[in-house]
Amino acid sequence: MSWIERIKSNITPTRKASIPEGVWTKCDSCGQVLYRAELERNLEVCPKCDHHMRMTARNRLHSLLDEGSLVELGSELEPKDVLKFRDSKKYKDRLASAQKETGEKDALVVMKGTLYGMPVVAAAFEFAFMGGSMGSVVGARFVRAVEQALEDNCPLICFSASGGARMQEALMSLMQMAKTSAALAKMQERGLPYISVLTDPTMGGVSASFAMLGDLNIAEPKALIGFAGPRVIEQTVREKLPLGFQRSEFLIEKGAIDMIVRRPEMRLKLASILAKLMNLPAPNPEAPREGVVVPPVPDQEPEA
């Protein structure tokens, strides 16, 4: 037996370690490999390049509102395929697929709760649900959010992330633009603040209605915001668009939005703005999240 064969005979094969799926992810911008749990703790913001990745509607609302204060509104509303619409796939099949993938019934989630102890109503889009498209249920839930804000005499916050109106619902989806805008007029009559937070992307019928009707329109960094997409505009005007066209930084230079706020700073910034608008005390950034039980410092044993 040669020395190589003797070495091979003493080698014990080991089982290849398997890494569960979803433990790691890659930044869409810089390509950095990131630990999924750490990225979630960082609110889906890349710690290397500060790229703001898309966030689920529920995670966004849970990161905004005080813990233990959240109550969901309009969860009983479900979309119906009234037109029996079909393109390459039946609309009802698209709905079933999106509901299974996201766990949501439709693209908008609405909750009421408190923000640093201040009552608010908040809505957030689930972009993974058919591109966050606006149909009749999205419009109905948004109106429900407005009605709840009027009933509670409190502010309304909406986080938009949408490709626009849902083509499978045709005119019924376009009608939601007028419906939601009319509902917001009641907020204005009452003198209650409505803050619109524009995230990547906010396009089409959503940007042409309630997303741009905020008393304050805030955007996340580098969010794509507009009506038609940049490629469509380039093909229409037959000109090369400026670098960064329709991004938050471009829009704030043109006065189309009021400010850009990083996601980790969004919660305190919204609370500070609303406190001023509602003539309430400024929030204490050091205060613990409402509903979180902070353990007391244990008594020290007296020294002998």
From Swiss-Prot:
Entry keyword 4Fe-4S: no
**Cofactor annotation remark:** Binds 1 zinc ion per subunit.
Q: Which UniProt keywords apply?
A: ATP-binding, Cytoplasm, Fatty acid biosynthesis, Fatty acid metabolism, Lipid biosynthesis, Lipid metabolism, Metal-binding, Nucleotide-binding, Transferase, Zinc, Zinc-finger
Citing just one GO molecular function, the answer is:
zinc ion binding
Assigned EC number:
2.1.3.15
Q: Name one GO cellular component term.
A: acetate CoA-transferase complex
Q: Which reaction does it catalyse?
A: N(6)-carboxybiotinyl-L-lysyl-[protein] + acetyl-CoA = N(6)-biotinyl-L-lysyl-[protein] + malonyl-CoA
Q: Which Pfam families match?
A: Carboxyl_trans, Zn_ribbon_ACC
- Give the binding site residues for Zn(2+): 27, 30, 46, 49
Q: NCBIfam families, alphabetically?
A: accD
* Known partners and oligomeric status: Acetyl-CoA carboxylase is a heterohexamer composed of biotin carboxyl carrier protein (AccB), biotin carboxylase (AccC) and two subunits each of ACCase subunit alpha (AccA) and ACCase subunit beta (AccD).
Per the record, the similarity remark reads:
Belongs to the AccD/PCCB family.
This protein is called Acetyl-coenzyme A carboxylase carboxyl transferase subunit beta
